[in-house]
């Protein structure tokens, strides 16, 4: 899966990442001059046994691109994983790198526990490892494993359950204290599960998105599906039909009015829903359209929806609800210095310009067996006919004439 530019936010601290670098600053504008910058290419690299190829020589060490990042619940800690198979942990007040630790495989997602004592990382081989926050140099511990690639991991707000989403359409709910003990499976998706989110204000509910182009609501402890929203049915006339390209790269929740937004990588659209908790249903509200590709979105509780887009002049925009409709905030709502920092650091975002859909390779390959069978049958019949013609002489050929001569002479006698 390719790395793309992304956002992470906690309280008023916003992180913008791209390539191997990230910038961290305040969204208020009062601390715009206090910008923390980090480049993973400068981080310590340690060789592991998995880094050696079959011939014993060092294998590809990676590009240092950031694959995933997240804040802890309080915002006190920030963690990221990169393409060089490292987990890097930071303290945010003040910003300081606490540790650089190696992971076994390249990671696809990570999250902090609610107690902020551990970081859970999910990797491409289907395993989840936990790393201590309180012991920054401690090694990772294997917690659980799937038989296929993991695409997301989440923890319930009470730290009782670990939820994992994989390429084989499954969402597993495991007990955190004994991850081998499975509480339930949430089954129903027909393609890979790209993202999951436990609803913060309703911790018994789970949102999930998939390559099948649906957004689903679950009561995850029982594995019961409450609702399935087909995103293809929300497209405008003339847009490309079908579910491919509607796998969400981000599900975000805004606690103020229970808004849920869904960002899909292949369309410059953000779908807006509202959660009706009393009915346990999602209500579709609006489609936000953009003239540029949207890389990521994230909610700030006090202000609205931040949107990171492929536009050098306005890389970061803010959207707010006005009279029940989401609208782009005036230019003055986004600090000029904040946008200036991003324009000056545009080189770190350029690597995400024009990148392909990172989920494209995850779709199941489909085969039309009947068409293939009929085609092969036709080819076989044509070959048989060709061989038959080669064995049989054509009418009027010398061989045909010779065979006819004895009969003719007998009649003449």
Swiss-Prot record:
User: What pathway does the UniProt record associate with this protein?
Assistant: tRNA modification; N(7)-methylguanine-tRNA biosynthesis
Question: Start-end of the WD repeats?
Answer: 61-100, 102-141, 145-185, 188-228, 289-329
Instruction: Write down the superkingdom of origin.
Output: Eukaryota
User: Does this entry carry the keyword Phosphoprotein?
Assistant: yes
* Example of a GO biological process term: DNA damage response
> Where on the chain is N-acetylalanine found, per UniProt?
2
The answer to whether keyword RNA-binding applies is: no
Pfam families per record: WD40
Q: Name the predominant localization.
A: nucleus
Q: Where in the cell is it found?
A: Nucleus; Chromosome
Q: Name one GO cellular component term.
A: chromosome
User: Residues where Phosphoserine occurs?
Assistant: 392, 412
Task: Name the UniProt key words of this record, in alphabetical order.
Answer: Acetylation, Chromosome, DNA damage, Nucleus, Phosphoprotein, Repeat, tRNA processing, WD repeat
Record text on subunit structure and interactions: Non-catalytic component of the METTL1-WDR4 complex, composed of METTL1 and WDR4. Interacts with FEN1; the interaction is direct.
Described purpose of this protein according to its UniProt entry: Non-catalytic component of the METTL1-WDR4 methyltransferase complex required for the formation of N(7)-methylguanine in a subset of RNA species, such as tRNAs, mRNAs and microRNAs (miRNAs). In the METTL1-WDR4 methyltransferase complex, WDR4 acts as a scaffold for tRNA-binding. Required for the formation of N(7)-methylguanine at position 46 (m7G46) in a large subset of tRNAs that contain the 5'-RAGGU-3' motif within the variable loop. M7G46 interacts with C13-G22 in the D-loop to stabilize tRNA tertiary structure and protect tRNAs from decay.
Q: Which HAMAP family match?
A: TRM82
**Protein name, UniProt field:** tRNA (guanine-N(7)-)-methyltransferase non-catalytic subunit WDR4
Q: What is the source species?
A: Mus musculus
